[in-house]
């Protein structure tokens, strides 16, 4: 079987976007690179760059190479760019909200605001805490087939049960 899905919403794939950055590029160059990959125009990036850099707290590093910036700079910049995009859906992974406590709190606040404004988050994570934080609906799949469209706690319970059951031959 095959098929397709047509979406009119703007989707921001935040999964592994920080890996696209180049260590020999400056923070500014990486912002344009990643923003462009996520669908932002150069004009949109130029307009939003000050708020992106402020959110990421990377103002002192703007024209430095990424390799000379703090180790968390890559993730902070990626997160800040994604949050600057006016999207309907954000697909994120478990490694996205990293870094210092103050930055993580800023990220969670941004997520809460986006959710209050109707944004949808598709989350891929090994940790139940991430699902509880982002999701109010749980989809549980087995071998590519939807088994349950339920609450997050119930979907997590199904996943735990499946891991405990012996695998068939």
Describe these PLM feature segments.
Residues 104-117:
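Helical segment within the ABC ATPase nucleotide-binding domain
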């Amino acid at each position: 079987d095959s098929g397709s899905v047509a979406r009119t919403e703007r989707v921001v794939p935040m999964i592994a976007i920080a890996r696209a950055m180049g260590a020999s590029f400056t923070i500014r160059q990486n912002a344009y690179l990643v923003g462009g990959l996520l669908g932002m125009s150069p004009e949109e990036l130029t307009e939003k760059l000050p708020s992106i850099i402020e959110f990421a707290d990377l103002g002192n590093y703007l024209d430095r190479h990424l390799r000379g910036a703090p180790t968390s700079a890559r993730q902070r910049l990626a997160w800040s760019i994604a949050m600057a995009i006016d999207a309907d859906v954000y697909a994120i992974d478990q490694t996205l909200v990293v870094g210092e406590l103050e930055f993580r709190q800023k990220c969670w606040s941004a997520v809460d605001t986006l959710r209050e404004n109707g944004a949808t988050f598709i989350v891929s994570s090994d940790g139940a805490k991430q699902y509880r934080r982002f999701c109010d609906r749980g989809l549980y799949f087995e071998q590519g087939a939807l088994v349950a469209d339920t609450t997050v706690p119930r979907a997590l319970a199904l996943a735990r049960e499946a891991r405990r059951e012996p695998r068939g031959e």
